[in-house]
Amino acid sequence: MKKQKTTTQKPKLTYRVNEQIRVPEVRIVFQDGTQQVMKTIEARRMAEDRNLDLIEVQPNAEPPVCKLDNLGKLLFKMDKRDKDLKKKQKTTTLKELRFHPNTDKHDFDFKTAHLEEFLRKGNRVRATIVFLGRSIIYKDKGLELAERLTERLSCVSNRDGDPKFEGKKLFVYFEPDKKKIDAFERIKAKTSGPAPAPAPLPVPAPEQKETPE
């Protein structure tokens, strides 16, 4: 079997051009901003004289608005614009770290440093506060921890909604904020230079199973 050739799809032109424009009159907008209403046949002739194309940009206007431009260059600009937009659209990955309502200061600082690093790289993060055994009676501690996380990560993110309980877990989501991250990076660069990467995370232990009491 012959392999099918893959072809790059060119951007589709939304409006009509040249002979496709069949209305009697059009309004031409020139590069200097001036406008002129003329017969379509005259506008096409003008475009040909200038080695340009007559391109309709506002088909619903009365009469339709057109401009004189190079169709090939216009398609190239549209293609470049689409590629630039795709480059800017980064896929967001959800990163998660687990806490307990009685998480000590060292563990809290260690894990929030990693959450902060994830956010600075443009990732969405989820902090999961796990209540083991009868610790679910200390929901207030979990909510206090969620507020501490929110305050600590506020320099690079925004909390996405309120903390939510599901069974014996409390979920807190954070979205990266580019403006905050840029400001944070500038301040950090001025004060201490490039920030060292946080220590590697340990391999998480299997979640403990509850035993009947």
Curated annotation (Swiss-Prot):
Summarize the protein's role.
Answer: IF-3 binds to the 30S ribosomal subunit and shifts the equilibrium between 70S ribosomes and their 50S and 30S subunits in favor of the free subunits, thus enhancing the availability of 30S subunits on which protein synthesis initiation begins.
Task: Give the organism the record lists.
Answer: Chlorobium limicola (strain DSM 245 / NBRC 103803 / 6330)
This chain's protein is named Translation initiation factor IF-3
Q: Which GO terms describe its biological process?
A: ribosome disassembly
Q: Which Gene3D superfamilies match?
A: Translation initiation factor 3 (IF-3), C-terminal domain (3.30.110.10), Translation initiation factor 3 (IF-3), N-terminal domain (3.10.20.80)
The reply to whether Protein biosynthesis figures as a keyword in the UniProt entry is: yes
Molecular function in Gene Ontology: ribosome binding; translation initiation factor activity
Share what the entry says about its subunit structure, partners included: Monomer.
Keyword Protein biosynthesis annotated: yes
Which Cys pairs does UniProt list as disulfide-bonded?
Answer: none
What subcellular locations does the record give? Cytoplasm
- The signal sequence is none
- InterPro entries, per database record: T_IF-3_C_sf, T_IF-3_N_sf, Translation_initiation_fac_3, Translation_initiation_fac_3_C, Translation_initiation_fac_3_N
Family, as annotated: Belongs to the IF-3 family.
Mark out the compositionally biased spans (Pro residues): 195-205
Keywords for the protein's UniProt record, in alphabetical order: Cytoplasm, Initiation factor, Protein biosynthesis
Q: What does the entry list under GO cellular component? A: cytosol; membrane
Stretches for region Disordered: 188-213
